[in-house]
Amino acid sequence: MNIAPRRPLFNRRPQSNIYRMFLWVMMILGGIWMIQKLTTGEIKPLFEPTPTPTRAVESFLLEGEANFTAGNLNNAITAYQEAVRVNPNDAVTWAKLARIQTYSSAFLITNAEKKERLLLALESARRAVELAPDDSTAHAILAFTLDWNANTSIYSDDLRQVDKFLVEAEQESLMALQKDNTNTLALAYYAEVLLDQQKWDLAEQFINQALEREDSNQMDVYRVNAAVLETLGQYNLAIPEYDKAIAIEPNFTFLYLRAGANYRRLALAILDPKAARPVYEKSLEYFQKAALINEQIGVKDPTPYLSISRTYSQLGEFFAAALNVQAALEFEPTNPDIYGQLGVVYFRSRNYEGSIFSLKCAIRGCSGDDSCLGRGLEKCNSALGPEYSENTIIGLPISPNTIVYYYIYGSVLSALSRPRDNKCGEANQIFSEVRAELVANPDAYTDGYQTIINIVQAGEAICQSLAEDGAPASSVLGEAVTSTPEVGVSDMTATPTP
């Protein structure tokens, strides 16, 4: 018996729907395609973060300005470099970067570091002018950067390059003023260029024009005005201008060094030691403030300690002076010039034996235990700290800046010579080198030529006497040393040394 199948009263039998199947197939194929694209990186996840968070240019500029004011110039440079990376066609930012790079060179120690930073600043300044050839400030900052590149200490072996920088700096200054003759920065920077060209009257004229402008309340303007007054010998007027610049940029230590040097120069002119003492102490305050700021912002610069040492030397406090030179050597234990300065301090304090080690390191170089003796230590012992480590020092060639170390060294060697400890061989070699330098560069020694010759002749006479009869040189030690101390180590210059 056939029984008909039961009808589905409550449930429908499943049936295939061709449209639904097609949709599923398309979704599966689409998913496979999506996975392949994600794997190859052609499609990024919707909420995946960007590789580098995007920051607005204004954010970098604010960060750079804040670091500049705080004295963290390396961080300021980094911020401005990021700003020009985001917006490479912004001439204003390139110009600001160049200005900061230029000023940052004052916080660097070696000439090689300064040269590298200043050349980078020059590239930035040229880029700003390239992007905005009609912008007065861009040309002014290029002039400023060129002027700071024209540094005779950096290019001592290529003075023609210094002249080239100065000529171009003047051209850019004139271009800046041609674009806008009321630009305060352009007026100030041009005054600085004129000052370095020794056109002092014109420099004074243009800085006065800058000071008359309503926006003259700028560190750059006060700094240049102070430099002009300082060069003209008006030290008492230069100091308040440096103070105004310091008030705007309180972490720019080179401003403190200049102000302190002006106080020391004023003190040197005061004949009464009691009256001069407070002025010297004011000088020390500025130098010590510079050292403290450097410590706070992480700048390892020996300059403040050398400035403190010079001030104590002028006060006749040679023990304190020597301690500060030794502190400077902790920052730069291979700098031969600092060894020379320590040797001069020892010499002026009549520590003649100690001066020999330091001066020898300065002009002949030294290494091993001799390097520690040159720093005033008994011997090297790195276990006591890094300041007791051995170092290799390369001697300084004779030049107008180093000749003082040579003739003092020769003078001490000859004066301390004895029949059984004759140092005249080395002394006479030094004297020969000094004479050769005087002949080779007579223009550099116009003022001190005769004094240096007298010192050389006194030393040669000692050695000649010793060679003839073996008489001990101690009988003429006083003559040899008393004619020497002030030569080449005083601050009797138009622009005081920090």
Give names to the regions the model predicted.
Residues 82-85, 123-130, 171-178, 208-213, ...:
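Conserved structural position within tetratricopeptide repeats
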Residues 88, 133, 181, 215-216, ...:
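Short coil turns that delineate tetratricopeptide repeat
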Residues 58, 92, 137, 144, ...:
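Start-of-helix register in tetratricopeptide repeats
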Residues 65, 99, 103-106, 144, ...:
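Residue-level recognition of tetratricopeptide repeat
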Residues 55-86, 106-114, 156-159, 268, ...:
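Alpha-helical segment of the N-proximal tetratricopeptide repeat
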Residues 96, 141, 189, 223-224, ...:
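Canonical tetratricopeptide repeat
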